[in-house]
Amino acid sequence: LIPSDPVLDRVLENNHRAGLPAHDVAANQGQFLALLVRLTQAKRILEIGTLGGYSTIWMARELPADGQLLTLEADAHHAQVARENLQLAGVDQRVTLREGPALQSLE
């Protein structure tokens, strides 16, 4: 039902190769997140827990040009993989990734 997306497929492969846990949302859940961003006309998004950036990419793609997504990731390895994936997907300019415990990152 959801067409294959070569970039998102590669992101999932990158996550697997990097040894990240397989906790990514399913494609239909990612599409639903994207729909929520579009319907609410969100300009700012806060995501707590980035993992490899898969859901981040789904949401960031739907942001307007002046939109911004802030995502928080406690694990340094996960954050590095996510940074690479965000760049691969071309959304790194709309996403700010803060590494460290979420409560400290929000201060």
Could you say what each language-model-derived stretch is?
Residues 20-107:
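S-adenosylmethionine/decaboxylated-SAM
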Residues 1-25:
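Rossmann-like AdoMet
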